[in-house]
Amino acid sequence: MGVANTSLRYSAFNFSLGRRFKSTSETLNDLPETISEVQTQLPSIDQMTNATADIVEQASHSVGELSTHIGYLNSIGLAQTWHWPADIIQHALEYVHVYTGLPWWGTICTVTILVRLLMFPIYVKSSDTIAKNSRIKPQMDKVTKELMATTDLAEGQKIAVRRRKLLSENGIKNRWLAAPMLQLPIAIGFFNALRSMANFPVDGFANQGILWFHDLTLSDPYLGLQFITAAVLMSFSRLGGETGAQQFSGPMKRFFIILPLVSIPATMNLSTSVVLYFAINGTFSVLQTLVLRNKWFRKKLNIAEVVQHPPDPTKENSGIFAAIKENMNTARERSEKRKLMKEEEERVHELIKKKRTNERIRIIRRPELKK
């Protein structure tokens, strides 16, 4: 019995051990099938890449939807006020972009043209004033020379009265001559507004360009916009400025030809959004100059004709730097004259004040005399 029990336990042990070895071997045999099943269930690298691209596209699409709503620029820290030029320009760009659906390059062009159209009546008045001044240029030059030559306060006042009378008789209000200077804060506003939008960058600036400048946040790689801007600036200066009536001397014409060429390296690192504004603004200036030089348009707009006077040969032969130096000397002389006349005026006022003090009569009543 004991031997039988021992043999039974031994056979049972062998049976269990065999089962264990058999189960381990079966597991190892099934391992490749399990790995293949896991590999088929996991996404491939291409699928993961496509999924990531879809997520990025959806995110950019959601941002693009935000940029087509009023208030987007304000939400990212731009267009914060309604009184600062750059903020006003950004508000205008946003309204045109949202309500017209134009891409950003078209929005910049549209807002630039709209602003210039609003300013066109001011340039009409300025052109008319310049033309009227050209009629009386010889008389005005004579009066101005007399005013610069005198140091007597009374005589200077008489000459100034003659000058005002001459302007009044010809219906000239020289305040319109400074009207085109309004373009300066507007240009600075456009520059700061577009530069801030490109530096952020605003959604759509990176892919809503046109032609060779698709990315409005980068500089023009071919400098095409810079050369266009320089060309139109030279054209409108040769045509008589934005009013179409300015008469530049020879040195000043050469100066305005060289200046746009200098602007090419100065603007080569600016974003294409900023230089696009310069190009469109300059192109409009050329068209405006052609309109204001046209006799039919001048007649319809009731603008006086420009009277051409022969230039001074001594000034015509001088160089650019000589002309600049002459203008600086003239400005300095005028400043010194104003200072001397102001000192003389203050001295006369002081003498009159002392004279009035000395001539003051004290009134004494009779009761005071009895005392």
Curated annotation (Swiss-Prot):
UniProt-listed InterPro entries: YidC/ALB3/OXA1/COX18, YidC/Oxa/ALB_C
Chain ranges passing through the membrane: 104-124, 255-275
Origin: domain of life: Eukaryota
Gene Ontology molecular function: any one: membrane insertase activity
Swiss-Prot/TrEMBL keywords: Membrane, Mitochondrion, Mitochondrion inner membrane, Transit peptide, Transmembrane, Transmembrane helix
GO BP annotations listed: protein insertion into mitochondrial inner membrane from matrix
Membrane topology, record value: Multi-pass membrane protein
Single GO cellular component term: mitochondrial inner membrane
Subcellular location: Mitochondrion inner membrane
Entry similarity comment: Belongs to the OXA1/ALB3/YidC family.
Summary of the function given for this chain in its UniProt record: Probably required for the insertion of integral membrane proteins into the mitochondrial inner membrane. Essential for the activity and assembly of cytochrome c oxidase.
The protein's name in its UniProt record: Mitochondrial inner membrane protein OXA1
